[in-house]
Structures are given as C-alpha cells and as structure tokens.
C-alpha cells in the first residue's frame, strides 16, 4: 500500500510510504519538498470535494490518498509561471525500429531461421503494444484525475465565494445600520461631552471608595467593628485613585482633549453644523469647569477626587478621552467615501468569482469519453497483436516438428502478410499514443490558464475578505464603544440617584426593624398563649364521646406566624448618610440637582396602630384565663373522681349548653354575629399593616409550618377553631359563616338544593334538631334538680360568650372587608371585560366600515381610470399588435430565409477583402460627416447663446413690467371692488367657452396627425413587403439555379479508400463554428428587432406625454389667468390702454423674434434632414456598389472553383487511364514471358531427348557389333536381353526423372509467376498509394485554404458587425441631436407661452371697462393655437424623418444579413463539392476496386465489424448504414454476435454485393442497435476470391 498524491499541473502521480498517513499534513509537505523539490509555500493540498488540507491535522483524517481518489497537489510556482508545464514524452527503445525490422525480415529467404526471427519480431511487437497500451491508459487516467482535481479546486472556490458573500452581506447589513445611526452616535457623543463636564464637578464620596476597595480585597463588611482598618483602606484608596492636587489638572486636560478629539473628526458634508455645536458645547464646558474649579478650590475637603477621576482610573490607559478619540477615529475610517468604492470592488470580485466561462471546461467530458473509446480500440489492437504473435509461435512449433522445407514458402508468405498487419496495428498504436500525449498537453495548457485565473481571483478575494473582516471588527468595536458612551453619559444621574436610594433605604431599614421587632415579640406571646390553651383543652376533650362525631377538627394547631425575626438584608450598602447627601447638594452642579433631593420619610402611623392593636389582642387573649382555669379545675376533678364515674357526667354540662345553641341557630342559615360591646379596638384593614409598598406578603404565611398542620384549605378553619373556649353558639356561627364564605369563593359550590349532598345534610340537620328538642324536654323536667349548678355555669358561659363575641367581631369585620373587596374586584373585572369587548367590537365595526368605504371609493376611482385608460390605449394597442404581427411575420420569413440560406455562407471566401477598401471609404465618409456635425454643433451653440441672451433681456423687461404693474394695482385696488364680481363672472364664462373651443381644436389636430402617421407607416410597410417579396423571389430563383448546379455536380461521384473518412472530424468542427456564427447572427437580429420595437414604443409614449404636457400647460395657464383675475382689479382705463398698447408693441416685437427663431430652427431642421437624406443616399449607393462587387467576386470564385473541379476530373481520368494502361501492359508482358519460358523449356527438353536417343542408338549399335563378333552368340543374346531389360528400366527411370524435373520446373515457373504478380500488385498498390497521398495532400491543402477563407469570412463578418454597430452609433447620435433640437424647440415654445400669457391677461382684466378692445385676448389665443399647430407639424415632421431613418437602417441591416446568408450557402455548397471531389475516384466501376459509396449489385466491398451495433457493416463514407444480412455470415466464414466474443471475431473481410434491400427500424430494441425510425440497407454478400 502506498499514499498517492496527484500533481494536477503536470498530471503526474507521486507515491509515498503509508507511514505518512499517521503523521500530519505538514510532515507530508516536508516529504514532498524533500523528494520532489517543491517548496512548502508553493504547495496546495486539496481533497476531492474542495476541502483544503490543514497543516495540523493528520493525513488519515481525510478520506483520500488512494490511486482512484488521490490527494490533489497544486504547485503555485508552476501556476504563476508564464509558460505552461511541459508533459514529459516517453519513447520506448524499439517502437521506432519496428518498421526497419519488419522490412529486413520481409527481405529474408524462406528458411527456418526467418520463421524464428519473424516469430521473435512478432513477440517484440506484442510486448511493445502492451507497453504502449498501458502508457496510453496511464495518460487517459491522468487526464481523468486532472479533471477531478479541477472539480475539487472549483468546489473550494465555490466555498470561498459563498463565505465571502456571507461576510459581505453581514458587513453590508451592519454598515447600513451604522449609517442610519450616525446622527444618533454624534448626539450621544455630545451628551457624553456634557456628562464629562458634569462628572468633573461631582465629588466622589470617601465611603464609596472604601466599599469598593473592600470588595476588591474580598474582606467582609463590618462597619461597626473595623473602623481603624477602614481608615487605613481609605488612605490607600485615596493614594490609588489620585492625589488631592491632581484632579483639577486631569479634569481640564480631559475636557480639552475631548474638545480636540471632537475637532479632529473627519469632515462630513452633512454634519458640519453638528460639529460646530459639539465644539461650542465642549468649549463652554471647559470654561465652566475651569471657573467652577477655581471658585471651589478653597472649599474642597482633603479627599478631593471627582467622579471623572475615578472612572478614568478604573481601566487605564482606556480613559474617557481615549474612548472618544477611538470613536472618532473609527468613524473617520468608516467614511462612506472610502467604504462605498471598496464595496463596489467587493461586488466586482464576486462577479469575477462567478465567471462560468472560466469555471466550466466546455467539451472536456466528451473529449475524455472519446479518449476512453480510443483506449478501448487500443486494447482491441493489443489483443489482435497477441493473437497474431501466438499464431507465429504455433507456426514455428509446427515447422520445427514437421521439419519439412516444402512448407516454408507458404508459411513465410503468410508470415509476411501477418507482419504487415502487425505493423499497421503498431502504427495505429503509435498514433493513439501521440493523440493521448497531445490531449494531455492541451489539457495541461488549458488548466494552467484557468488555475492562474483561479489563483489571482482567490488572492483578490482573500485580500478583500481580510479587509472586510477588519472593517466588520471596526464597526462592531465602534458600536460597543457607543454603548459604553451611552452608559457613561448617564453616569452623573445614576450616581446621584444611587446615593439618594442608599439614604432612603437606610432610613427605611431603621423603621422597618423597629416595627418587625415589636410584631415578632407580640406574635410570639399570642402564639404561645393559644398553644397552651389548646393543649389544656385537648387533654380534657381527648377522651370525650363527642370528639370525632360532633366536634371534628378540634385536634388542629395554629400556624406559627410572626414568631421569628426577618432575615437580614441591605447589609452591604455603603455608609452614606444625610450629611454626605447634603455635601453633594452643595458641591454638585445645577444639572444634577433635581436628582439629589432628600427622600421623604414614610408615614409610620399605621405601624404604630398595628402595634397597639397587637397589644390589645394579647391583653384580650390573656383576659380569658378564667375559662382556662375552669378547664384545669375540670381536669383535676377527673383525676380525683372515682373510676365508676362515666365519661357522660363530665360532658353533661357541655351537652346541656349545646341545647341553647341548637335552639337559637339553624344549620341551614346561620345568623351573623352581633357584638354590642367590644373589649378591644377595631383592627386595621390589611392594607394598613405594612408601610410604603411593604405589605403582609413580606412574611410567608405558609412556610412556617407546625407539626400538626394540615393542607392550606384546612388551615383557615383551624385558625377559626382556635376559639374553642368561646360559647358553642358563637363558635358554630363563626364556623358556619366561614364555610359559607369558602363555598362562595370555591370554584364549584354546591348550590343545588335537590342534590344528594344537600338532601343528606337536611336529613342530618332534622335528626339533630329532633334530638335537641328531646333533650330540652328532658332538661326542663330535670331543671329543678340541677338549678344551682346551672347558675354557676351560666355565669361562666356569659363571660366566655362575651370574649368570643369580641374575637368574632374582629374576624367578622375582616371577612366582611374581604368579601366586599372580592365582590368589588369581580365587578370591576366584569365591567372592564365587557367594556373592552364593546370597545373592540365598536373599533372593528368602525374599521370595517372605513375599509368598505375606502375600498368602494378606490374601486370606483380605479374603474374610472381603467376605463379611460382602456379607451385611450385600445387604439394604440391595436396598432402595436398589428405592427408586432407584421414584425413576427417578417421574423418568421427571415428565419426561413436564414434556414434556406445557411448553406451558402461556407463558400464566401475572398469576398471580404474588397469590403476592407469599402470600409475605408465609409470611414472617410464618416469622418467628413463627423466634421460637418461638429460644424453644425458649433452653429447650434452660437444660436443657443443668442437665445439665452434674448431670454435674459425678455426676463428683465418682464421684471420691469411686473414692478410697474404691482405699483398700479396697489394704488387702484380700493376703487374697483364693486365691479370685480360681475366682471369675473363674465370673464370666466368667456374663458371657459374659449378653452373648450381651443381644446377641441387641439384634439382634432392631434387625431389628424396620428391618422396621417398611421397611413404613412402603412404605406412604408407595404413598400417594404413588396420589395422583400421581390428579393425573396430573386433569391429563390438563384437557389433553384444553384440546386441544379449541385445536382449536376453530385452526378460525378466516385470512390475513395478508407483513410479519407478521418477528414470528417474537421468538417464537423467547421459545422460547429458555422452553427455558432448562425446562432450569434440570430441573436443579433433578435436584439436589433427588439431594440427597434422598444424605440418605437418609447417614441409613442413620448408623444403621449407631450400631448398630456400640452393639455396640462393649457390648464395651468387657465388656472394662472383665473388667479390673476381674482387678485388683480380693474384699473384706470386710459392709462391701461396706453400702457397696453406699448406693452403689446414690445411683446409683438418679442414674438417676431421668437417666430424668427422658430423659422431658423425649422430651417436648421430642414438642413439636417437634407444632410440625413444625402447620407442615406450615399450609404445606399455604397451598399449597392458593395453588393455588385460581391456578386462579381462570387461569380469569379464560382468560375475558379468550376475550373478547379474540371482540372481535378481531368487529372483523375488521366490517372485512371494510365493505371489501366500500365496494368494491361504488365499483363501482356507477363503472358509473353510465360509463353517464352514454356517454349524454351520444351525446346530444351526436345534437345535433351534427342541427345539421349542418339546415345542409346549408338550404344545399341555398338553392342550389336560386339555380339556379332563374339562366337558365343547365344550366350551373348541372353546377356543382351538382360542388358536390354536393364537399359529399358534405366530409360523408364530417366523418363520419370525428366518428368519430375519438368514438373518441378513448371512449379518453379508458376511460383515465379506468382511472385512477379505479387510484386506487380505491390508496385501497383504503392503507385496507387503515392497517387492517393498526393491527391490527399492536394485536397488537404484545398481544405486548409477553405478553412483559412472561412476564418477570413468570419473576421469579415465581425468587421461587418462593427460596421453595423458604428451605423447604429451614428443613428444614436442623430437621435440625440434630434432630442436636443426638440428640447430647444420646447424651451422656445414655453418662453413664447410665458410671454403671451401676460399679454392675454391684461386686456381680459380690463375688458369690462374697455369694450373697444375685445380682439386682443382672441389674438393671443390664436397665436398660441398657431404655435401649437406649428409644434405638432414639427413633431410630425421629426417623426417622419426618424421613421425614414429607422426604415433605411432596417433595410441596410436586412441587406447585410442577406449577403451573409448567401455567403453561408455558397460556403456550404463549395464544401459539398470538395467532399464529393475528395470522395470521387473513378466513374467506371472496376471489379478489383473497393466501393465505398452507392453500393450496387456486383460491387467489391469491405465488410468490417462495428462494435457499436454488434454487427458487420459495409465500410462507407455516406451517412446511411449498410448492414450485412445474417444469412451471408456462413458464406463469408463469419460468426454472429451472439455466438462469439469481440476478440474471436474477424475484424474485416472482402465480399461482393448480391442483394440490397431498404429497411427501417420499427422497434426501439432491435438487433442492429439503432434508434427507432432509423433508415438503413440490409445487404447480402458472398466471399470474394481473386483467382475466380
């Protein structure tokens, strides 16, 4: 296992030991520095996902470091270099020598050694292929990792931008709040200045410093025990705070420094007055303080420390002066003049960070996918090399095992073919390697530029982020300091209030402790007395029969209340006395005197009354000791009595006493207690028990518990049961009364008399009444027997009853008060709730009514306005809709024209060279036009100056007239009051009539002008449509002619080999560029059309506004006239007539001047129109000349291309003819040589045969002579017969040998012929390849020229766009000039209107007294009407001029677009011609040529395996697919896709076409793996045999 780090700059993987994963990132950086010499400061380590690795964290905490997910390293030194990092190119030792080795091995003879050397070469080629494939895979893997690294750094950039945006948003929000509160901060600082001056005058009390010093040292407070230590601490505190001589100087220095800091604030244009106020207040405070200090130096005691000195000492060196200085420094740093440009820079950095063109690498994923496909083809080539190498090894093993030399020639020939295939595969692998290396280098170059951008952008963002953080800190610190300032400004008031509060609390504690002591003392006595009484009664009543039956609850105990002293509080208060407060009153300034008032003492009378009441209650409780004495006597009697005495005898007097109770009281309705004589005074109400907001709740009634207490509900009854010694009637009445009270206050009282509980109670009470009545009868019969005992008991009972009545009367009064208050509070609550409900309902009703009324009124107004607006804008909308529809139709037609003419742009190559010269001419024309425009501007400037002078003179005259007029009005105002009303009524009527007439005239004129404009626009649109239709017809005719030419050229199609298919990629790139240019042109057209429509809309809105302004101006004039009529009065007729005549003459002269100015402006407009028309005619003529030149150049280029095409066709025909002639000549030579060789062999064989026959005849003759000579003829005959037989056998053997030799010679000749044929074929192929390469080079040059021309056309298009932009700029200038003229005309119109207003006013004012001058106001009205008509005419003329300009500019743009479209079409056609030329070879089909287009039956085709479709297809350069029929697979010895893998299937085979059928995919899932609806051919073919 290793740790993988990927260097993104160069795309290399760095490996390290896994021990570094346990160590920190800093150790990893040191390891990278030591191993790869990359400095630590230049290293940036990023994990997938964008997280940057921290130096102090361990490497293993990040989920990265594997080979698939490495740590991405960025070298900043490489990024900041100007040159991109170079990718190292790896070359293997044998990859370049393979071709030489193959050529050498092909030259070797057919021997075993050649077989072994070729197998070794094949194995070497396979090894090299494996290395190349692994190298290419590594390169592509590195590119994938580079892509991942770029994605990681982009994620990091995204995180940085998000954090930067959050920081900026936070700062903007805080800074906006700060800007809103600047004035508040300045006000707080001024308050602090006044507070500082006050604090300097307030002396610090000595006891306060002792207290704080004691708190610092942590010593306990002991005010009475440690007086000596307090004195020592006081001395130390005075030494620590300040010496007695220092405070004056420090105070003055502080105030002066505060003043200086106020002066040194950054000057704010809005807050200068506030700064002056601050300075004045500071100076006044300094002067006052110096005077006060000088006056009071003699009166100050020894401990002379002010409150300001103590505050300054608390946090040295941060005193008040430094606090204020820091506040003003930070405010000057946060000046909007400094911050706002910085904020703009921050927003610009955010925009730079969000640059999508730099973030996204367009087309990289498609490129990586293509590289993956290339790697897959590379692996296929390696597998093919492997199979071939294994075949070589197998053939070598067979040859070694057979050891037959006759097999070697065929084996060597097949080896040669296989070596050529391996060499081709090797070349392909080298090509793939080259492509991969170039792709990696290009990606590295691209990433270098983008990483440099990323580095600079992030650096800028970091710098701005640091500034933002510093500014944010500054704002936060400033706001915190302002809070401190706010707190310090309230210190004098708080100091005085705290001193007063301490004095008040001291006074209160004194009285409160006295009252609490007396209360606790009396409470203890009362509680102990009650406790002893209950204990004695409990001992007596414990064994009674009535204990748990009739008298329940007698075992309860009273709760302990006011038996303990309250806890200590306010122990740590400083020792401030009234003397100290008076001292402060005498020395503190007047600003603080309202806060230093002596607190008023509480009203302690209720406390004294409460103490007296408690004393009386204790006396009353102690006065009942006779009852307790009787109880003790009874207890003693029980002890003395005998054991025979029953418990009933002891309880008999109690039972007898109860009879009285039952007779007098009823259980259902107990009567209230009536106390006649009270032994103790009335108890105060509960509100008076506590003084000054200290009520009875200070003591917790429930917390002091008793061991025998029950729940809180029962404790109230227990308190009432404490009166058990009282007579039983009173006791029962009190209990019943309490129960009723509880039932009233309880949430669920039992009030139903028919409920089961009430029925049981009634039954129980009836039974008790019956028993009591029976007892009364018994006692009446026995009354005489115990009369003496009754008398004594009766006396005692009366005493007890009196005491019980006293106690119950006090309780009854308390309960009555409580009940009264409870009912009062409940009534108040109910009344309040009802009142709130009623008021809420009333308010809601009012709000709803107001809402309804407002909604109704608003709806009515809105509907009226909507109706008026609908009526006004319906006609405008109809016109605009018509225009928009016409524009949409035009756009659609333009789009159709664009689509139809897109093919012509590719063929316009040399046209734009002439446009340069034309552009120069246009530039000259533009310069001349600019000069003329400058001259016109100068003239306009001079005229404008003259108009200003005239206006000034007119204004002076008007001011003089107004002064005279005002004087006369003041003198004659009192005389003409009686005539005012009649004259005003008549004038109002006449003015109303005239206004209506003038308004109707203006409206009619406006409608007429609008109708004229509509008619003119419609005529122009019709003319445009007619011209557009004629141009479309002409273009359609041209298109038809061009289509005929294309059809003529498309008939000349021929064949070409497989290698030309690689040029399609270049054409695709050109198509992409063309599509981009088309889209840009479309966008330009859309934008121009939208701009024109918007301009038209704005002009229409301007016209409406002008009409509305005119109406408003007329209305304003009428209102002014009415106001003047109401203010002014009739004056002397004779003087006014004379003055009026003079003023009218002056005004006529001014009006003449204004009309002359109007005429001059109209003449200037005419001149401008003429110049515009001239410029338009010039531009039209120049454009027509440009079009003519373009047409001429197009025809010349077409002629050139036709000539080139003819020359190419002639060259091809010559080549084909020469090739055929060479081939025939070679075949003839081969036949001739073959015949010659056969004849020579036969001749030699005949000669040899004759020689052998001659030799045999001579031998026979010689043998016959020998036989004849010898005597033993018979023996010789036998020998001769044996010799003849032997000779015959020899002859036969020799014949056989000769025949074998002949056969061998024939075989050799045949092999030689085959070798000659193969060599001829190879020569033919090489010649054909050379011709092809030449043709290819020529066509590549043509394509390059075309691409260069296309680039030039694109450049020229850009220049045309610039020209269009310049024309649009000229148009904008003209529009601006027009606007300026309109503004001047409007100014002149307003001035004329203002001048005509007083002229019309004067005669109308005095019309009642001067009937001889009725025509003067009518003249002024007519003049204003004439001026309005002139303005409307001028506006209509300007509108027509503007529309003419817009239409002419539209025509120019349309002409340029059409020329561009024609160029695109011609470019496309020329590209198609070039493609057809490059794909055409020989028109006549030859049997031994491979067809690559337009397959027919009998054509020789190349059948290849297409892995995308998993089928065999015919190799073609056309877009249509030709699939091989599945029935033809066995005939061609091919395997189907289902039965064999891609490695074992043959990659290609040659065949002949037998059948062809046209098909279409009807299912999405099909065996050819094509999309639904795809059209293709299915072809049947047979194997091609060269011999056949």
Swiss-Prot record:
InterPro entries: ATG11, Atg11_C. It comes from Mus musculus. One of its GO terms (biological process) is negative regulation of apoptotic process. This is RB1-inducible coiled-coil protein 1. Pfam families: ATG11. GO terms for cellular component: Atg1/ULK1 kinase complex; autophagosome membrane; cytoplasm; cytosol; lysosome; nuclear membrane; nucleus; phagophore assembly site. Its main location: nucleus. It is found in: Nucleus; Cytoplasm, Cytosol; Cytoplasm; Preautophagosomal structure. Residues 638-674 are annotated as: Disordered. Part of a complex containing ATG13/KIAA0652, ULK1 and RB1CC1. This complex associates with ATG101. Interacts with PTK2/FAK1 and PTK2B/PYK2. Interacts with GABARAP and GABARAPL1. Interacts with ATG16L1; the interaction is required for ULK1 complex-dependent autophagy. Interacts with RNF111, SKI and SMAD7. Interacts with COP1 in the cytoplasm of proliferating cells in response to UV stimulation. Interacts with TP53. Interacts with C9orf72. Interacts with WDR45B. Interacts with ATG13; this interaction is increased in the absence of TMEM39A. Interacts with WIPI2. Interacts with TAX1BP1. Residues 858-1393, 1440-1479 form a coiled coil. Keywords: Autophagy, Cell cycle, Coiled coil, Cytoplasm, Lysosome, Nucleus, Phosphoprotein, Transcription, Transcription regulation, Tumor suppressor. Phosphorylation at Ser-733 of the FFAT motif activates interaction with MOSPD2.
